[in-house]
């Protein structure tokens, strides 16, 4: 992920790959995000600002539901509105995630005790794998759009 966020500036961060697609918007002093009702291709491609919010959303929700109070909702996970604060937030979440997971005894990975969101009744190691896939998918999408953005500016 860091390779795709390095050198990223706010102009590219807020650019849209298409007129239609998931994005963030500033409303009443708060950066809010679109939320898809479907994952069909017709919704359009997401912007980098939306993808980075999506990363903070997944990590924040899983951290809260696996290691915290379990009360955090999607609406409470707001976009930061700029790339520097977003990078800082992603790094804080990464550090917190590594600290929490590293502190678990091995048997906790086989337990279902911490698997509370977005699914239950599965060993915690399956949640770890699922989260890694989601984060890497978002990172790949950011990288792909950065290629498109770079050639469009030439």
Could you describe each region identified by the protein language model?
Residues 2-76, 114-154:
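Short, contiguous alpha-helical
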Residues 78-110, 126-136:
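Acidic/histidine-rich alpha-helical segments that form the ligand environment
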């Amino acid at each position: 992920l860091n390779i795709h966020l390095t050198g990223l500036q706010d102009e590219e961060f807020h650019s849209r790959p298409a007129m239609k697609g998931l994005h963030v918007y500033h409303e009443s002093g708060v950066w809010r995000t679109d939320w898809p009702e479907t994952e069909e291709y017709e919704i359009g491609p997401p912007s980098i600002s939306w993808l980075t919010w999506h990363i903070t959303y997944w990590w924040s929700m899983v951290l809260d539901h696996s290691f915290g109070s379990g009360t955090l909702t999607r609406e409470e996970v707001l976009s930061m509105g700029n790339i520097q604060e977003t990078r800082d937030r992603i790094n804080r979440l990464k550090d917190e995630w590594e600290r929490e997971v590293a502190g678990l005894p091995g048997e906790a990975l086989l337990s279902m005790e911490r698997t509370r969101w977005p699914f239950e009744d599965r060993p915690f190691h399956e949640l770890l794998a699922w989260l890694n896939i989601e984060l890497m998918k978002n990172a790949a999408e950011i990288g792909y759009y950065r290629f498109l953005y770079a050639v469009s500016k030439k």
